[in-house]
Curated annotation (Swiss-Prot):
The protein's name: Protein N-terminal glutamine amidohydrolase
Protein source organism: Anopheles gambiae (African malaria mosquito)
Protein family (similarity comment): Belongs to the NTAQ1 family.
Active site: C24, H78, D94
Annotated function: Mediates the side-chain deamidation of N-terminal glutamine residues to glutamate, an important step in N-end rule pathway of protein degradation. Conversion of the resulting N-terminal glutamine to glutamate renders the protein susceptible to arginylation, polyubiquitination and degradation as specified by the N-end rule. Does not act on substrates with internal or C-terminal glutamine and does not act on non-glutamine residues in any position.
Recorded GO CC terms: cytosol; nucleus
Record key words, sorted: Hydrolase
Length: 211
């Protein structure tokens, strides 16, 4: 299928994607790597998105690790992958959601983040959006955040070696940080994140504007 086809999907089967529980930042890095290998022309249209806040307490719904019928969980941070091939089409690939893989941006945001209005300020979600190419070049992690004080693993790590760059062995905190103007990519609050990536259908097309 051509990448210009309206039904084209970068990843057609979630089971073909690299996945290790509780290592969402590496899972998304692997998705970026896969696109670079298989559909390099699409890489400029792809993003890694970190969700967190100053207190690192962000509520997300529809998560496999969540509780209750609505699958609510509070993470310190979360990471998902986005493909934005055209202004009116943006798909979210989240390996940890109970929603379909992928899910259209508006549905994903509506069901996963809902609204900040009903939440206390310390639970408001912020989003660091990083172009996939930049994420591949600058992200690194020695997985220290997944070790207990005695050195044992909180969750088993991926079988492949830690992701490193020539400049850093552990840049994860730079990506989790939600201070605007600091770190890679751009930081948005929920409202501006939606405005940036969701373009509602133009219902005024074909109608005459009255002055």
């Amino acid at each position: 299928m051509s990448t210009n086809d309206a039904n084209f999907m970068l990843f057609s089967n979630i089971n073909d994607c690299s996945y290790v529980s509780c290592y969402c930042e590496e899972n998304v890095w692997k998705l970026c790597e896969q696109v670079k290998k298989t559909y390099p022309s699409e890489l400029p249209k792809c993003y890694a998105v970190f969700v967190s806040n100053e207190r690192r307490t962000v509520p997300l719904w529809r998560q496999k690790a969540g509780r209750g019928d609505e699958k609510l969980v509070i993470w310190d941070y979360h990471v998902f992958f986005m493909h934005n091939p055209s202004p009116n089409r943006c798909l979210v690939f989240d390996l940890d959601t109970t929603l379909p893989f992928p899910t259209y941006f508006h549905k994903y945001v509506t069901e996963t983040f809902r609204s900040d209005y009903a939440l206390t300020p310390e639970h408001h979600r912020f989003f660091r959006v990083i172009p996939a190419e930049k994420y591949l070049a600058e992200f690194s992690s020695d997985r220290r955040h997944m070790r207990r004080p005695d050195g044992s693993w909180i969750k088993p790590p991926p079988s492949y070696p830690p992701i490193q760059t020539s400049a850093s062995t552990h840049s994860l905190d730079d990506f989790i940080c939600m201070k605007p103007g600091k770190g890679p990519g751009a930081v948005y609050d929920l409202l501006h994140f939606v405005q940036q990536f969701y373009k509602p259908p133009d219902r005024n097309i074909g109608t005459k504007t009255q002055n």
